[in-house]
Amino acid sequence: MSGLRISLDDLESDSDDSAQMTHQVLRLGEITVSAEGLTTSMGYKYGLSPDDVVVSATGFLGQGSSGSVRRATHRKTGEALALKEIKITSQAHLQEIRRELETLHREGNNSPYLVGFYGAFCHEGSVFIAMECMDGSLASVRKPVPTEVLASIARSILRGLWDLHRNRHLIHRDLKPSNILFSLDGRIKISDFGVSSFLECTRANAHSFVGTLTYMSPERLKGESYSFAADIWSFGLVVAELALGRCPFTEKLARANSSTEAGFWVLLQHLSSDGPVIVLPPTMDSALADFISACIQKDSQSRPTCEELLQHPFITNAMKDDDKHVIKEWLLLMAMQAELIPSSAERETPLMTQSGATASLNLDDELSKLVR
């Protein structure tokens, strides 16, 4: 394993005693992370160390809000992991690590709609977080997504958000397609909690400015206080992007010439105007259009909650089949249309390896090629 070769004692600290660095040990509130793994103040321990994982040399999975993610394997069990490395170069990184670890520890193994958590450890100036390895993100799927499939995806995301909002009092603050993961068996899970924020009650508000600009709500762009409705805005834009096949603000942001500051002012000016947030095509399913419009109301108080959205006709009128089944069948159809796997008639003839030996069809491998 590789990492930034620095001593944690060399880093600057601030007055926040909840995040302390001593040699290769991090004390983050109720959580302590060392080379031997993660422990909590309540005595819970995740026994995971650098020697327990084998990192794939070619398994780069993506870039999160605060670090890179690679595919790895647990040495003893052979289980696939997504290993996120966060190089510690500032006190701000420690706060991100604390937020993510606290959320993963408390929620990652308690909800089927949040990515699972296996442990964390320190190594050579970095913190490594081991999570459930999914097969791709919504940023990588072919778009536009069919309406009935989109309803199943949206329902799964809403159930994850509902768990964060109602049961955990957490605002995700960085909901976007790349932070919503899927597995080839049709599961949808929310990930990347490095900028999430805890609210003591459901009527509280947050104030800090973090997250991805494109999916940020008007109240957040304006520097106003915000609450769970900010996530609903981001969710609405994610659904719109999957339905339209592109980010709704792509053309407007193109004028910013890749400048974050210019993009900020372009979006702020657009969302402060009297015009519509986005113009949906008249051919769009009416229930879907109404669903998206409800999520992206400029007035945060006018946006529905997750619970209310789960009762919207776009969701309730969708196919009653199991959401996992609907999503899995869609992934299979995409693969077949891309001719990455043979049709049912062709499957009667065994596939051949380069050496001429008979091989079985590995559907998961073929689907993985499609979405990467």
Segments predicted by a language model, with ranges:
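Protein kinase glycine-rich loop
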Residues: T58-G64, V69
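Activation segment signature within eukaryotic-like protein kinase domains
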Residues: I153-A154
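Activation-segment/catalytic-loop signature of the eukaryotic protein kinase fold
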Residues: A120
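Conserved N-lobe beta3->alphaC-helix segment of eukaryotic protein kinase catalytic domains
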Residues: E85-N109
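Conserved short submotifs of the Hanks-type protein kinase catalytic core
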Residues: E124-S137
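Conserved catalytic-loop aspartate of Hanks-type protein kinases
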Residues: D231
